UniProtKB/Swiss-Prot annotation:
It comes from Nitrosospira multiformis (strain ATCC 25196 / NCIMB 11849 / C 71). This is Gamma-glutamyl phosphate reductase. Disulfide bonds: none annotated. InterPro entries: Ald_DH/histidinol_DH, Ald_DH_C, Ald_DH_N, Aldehyde_DH_dom, G-glutamylP_reductase_CS, Glu-5-SA_DH, GPR_dom. It is an enzyme of class 1 (oxidoreductase). The gene is proA. GO terms for molecular function: glutamate-5-semialdehyde dehydrogenase activity; NADP binding. The keyword Oxidoreductase applies. GO terms for biological process: L-proline biosynthetic process.
Length: 421
């Protein structure tokens, strides 16, 4: 397609999504749940077609010389297809937030004032080589009463088209407009540029992917964006930490999975406990193949540690690499997190109630924890069900974004002929 055709194509999708959003916003919970259930049925039934489409994508990715990690994210298996279907059923089982009324109170005038939860409208979701996001995003947006325009990575085009066919079937079976969930069929990057500027059709953009993608979307979008750029997560081991807890939590936070945005990237340790806790903890890291980069005080305790450079403190490694720093106080730990952190997830290990309270209050991140692994920063673990992503912004949603984060609120006023005096 040329630029004019892309614009025409995207505006057509946008108009259809806007029209569908009005119908989805008032759809009954039972209809939405039926659509989700039928999507899951179609995905299970069409497993072989989905795997065949995915095999084409994987073969093309290998021919293009894409990284092994990307190919791994791209690849579907019978287990991951079953997981997609199960995810849709789990979304169907979640409470419907749309229409929920809260904070309803009588005012002195006699009127009642409250808030009602309402859909956002049309959500544009841009993601890379993760076909499962097509099903997850479709399910979450639908349950929250929104229409969605999905733009997956070009490397997953055949997989996304196959999953989208199952999504459309579910919508049609439930009597809902098939245009409520649309997958952009072109791999032309100009479509992304058009999507993030169609403010007359799209209400919010959710990018999911690497830093380069999210920076591009943030810079080009003329529509609100729900995002996080980096996951530079910290654990601070306080001088009053239980050492056994500290070692167990810090080990899990780093080594359970290396490539997630809630993985520990920088470990801060109080100088009064560093000599006791770092040797056994770092032995665990080194035995698991984690490269350690530390400040001079850390290196003095662990000779195998490499020297940390200034850029290390800012880095989300997404790899078996960890920065380590010895600090003199809770104040210095909080200052370090303030300067180098990404406002994603940070945790303190301590038995001191006052220090825990200060850390919770003063660390300005979307998730702040006490005596818990940063790996818990996840919508499912928080009881939100599935999540569309994690936001480190302070406006509209913050932290893991589940169904409620895909809605807004409006004020409702109930009277009985009341007039203002």
């Amino acid at each position: 397609m040329d630029i004019i055709d892309i614009k025409t194509y995207m505006h057509s999708i946008g108009r259809e999504a806007r029209a569908a959003s009005r119908l989805i916003a008032k759809a009954e919970t039972a209809a939405k749940n039926r659509a989700l259930t039928q999507m899951a049925v179609a995905i299970k039934r069409d497993e072989q077609q989905l795997l065949a489409a995915n095999a084409r994508d994987v073969e093309n990715a290998k021919e293009r010389g894409l990284e092994a990690a990307m190919i791994d994210r791209l690849t579907l298996t019978p287990k991951s297809v079953a997981s997609m279907a199960e995810g849709l059923l789990q979304i169907a089982a979640l409470a419907d937030p749309v229409g929920e009324i809260s904070d309803l109170n009588y005012r002195p005038s006699g009127i009642q004032v409250g808030k009602m939860r309402v859909p956002l409208g049309v959500i544009g979701i841009i993601y890379e080589a993760r076909p499962n996001v097509t099903a997850d995003a479709a399910g979450l947006c639908l349950k929250a009463g929104n229409a969605a325009i999905l733009r997956g990575g070009s490397e997953a085009i055949y997989s996304n088209q196959a999953i989208a066919a199952c999504v459309r079937e579910g919508l049609k079976t439930a009597g809902l407009p098939e245009t409520a969930i649309q997958v952009i069929e072109t791999t032309d990057r100009a479509a992304v540029g058009e999507l993030v500027t169609m403010k007359e059709f799209v209400d919010v953009i959710v990018p999911r992917g690497g830093k380069g993608l999210i920076e591009r979307i943030s810079n080009e979008a003329r529509i609100p964006v729900i995002k996080h750029l980096d996951g530079v997560c910290h654990i601070y081991i306080d001088e009053e930490a239980d050492q056994e807890k500290a070692i167990r939590v810090a080990d899990n936070a780093k080594t359970q999975r290396y490539g997630t945005c809630n993985t520990l990237e920088t470990l801060l340790v109080h100088e009064n406990i560093a000599g006791e806790v770092l040797p056994p903890l770092c032995r665990i890291y080194l035995d698991k193949g984690v490269e350690l980069r530390g400040d001079p005080a850390s290196q003095a305790i662990i000779p195998e540690m490499k020297e940390a450079r200034e850029e290390d403190w800012y880095t989300e490694y997404l790899a078996p690499v960890l920065s380590v720093r010895v600090v003199s106080s809770l104040d210095q730990a909080i200052e370090h997190i303030t300067i180098y952190g990404s406002q994603h997830t940070d945790s303190i290990i301590t038995e001191n109630y006052s220090n825990a309270r200060r850390f919770l209050r003063e660390v300005d991140s979307s998730s702040v924890m006490v005596n818990a692994s940063t790996r818990f920063a996840d919508g499912f673990e928080y009881g939100l069900g599935a999540e569309i992503g994690i936001s480190t912004d302070k406006l509209h949603a913050r932290g893991p974004v589940g169904l409620e984060g895909l809605t807004s609120q409006k004020f409702i006023v109930l009277g009985d002929g009341h007039i203002r005096q």
